[in-house]
């Protein structure tokens, strides 16, 4: 039931993308659900845990985000958490059924000194038998490769394109 890399289409034409975009919403949901059911048991869910490893002080101006330093929120600027705190939370997540542990930081982009810390976090969390995920802002290609090489499974990056933000 697991998806093979050969099943992933990555050569979409503009017309094909437009055809998907123009689908009525319920038809789009049906097609998405059909693909999901083809490759996954529809009655199973994956439990993931997200932990903020560095809270507050992000220089970006996303109006909806409490992490932004540009708005008056109740979020205090905190330093990056020590590795021991992160591993303790990852173990707790695993022991409570999570199979993926995502670490998020309020950064615009990743500095080299923070990259070294995050690489160690990824290695240690991976050693616990968890899938690893991070959301750290913008990365260079080299940084992405370095994270991949230490075992990172997933990278989340929010793309905020609304004129409202």
Language-model features: locations:
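Flexible, acidic/Gly-rich N-terminal and inter-domain linker regions that tether
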Residues: 1-64
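Conserved Radical SAM active-site core
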Residues: 69-165
């Amino acid at each position: 039931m697991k998806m093979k890399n050969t099943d992933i289409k990555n050569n979409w034409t503009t017309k094909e993308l437009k055809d998907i975009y123009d689908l009525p919403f319920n038809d789009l949901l049906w097609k998405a659900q059909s693909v999901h059911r083809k490759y996954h048991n529809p009655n199973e869910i994956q439990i993931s845990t997200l932990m903020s490893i560095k809270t507050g002080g992000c220089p970006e101006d996303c109006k909806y985000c409490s992490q932004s330093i540009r708005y008056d929120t109740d979020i205090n600027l905190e330093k990056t958490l020590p590795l021991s705190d992160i591993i303790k939370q990852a173990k707790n997540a695993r022991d409570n059924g999570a199979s993926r542990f995502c670490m998020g930081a309020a950064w615009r982009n990743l500095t080299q000194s923070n990259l070294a810390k995050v690489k160690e976090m990824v290695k240690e969390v991976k050693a616990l038998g968890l899938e690893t995920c991070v959301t750290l802002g913008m990365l260079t290609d080299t940084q992405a490769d370095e994270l991949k090489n230490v075992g990172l499974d997933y990278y989340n990056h929010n793309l905020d394109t609304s004129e409202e933000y």
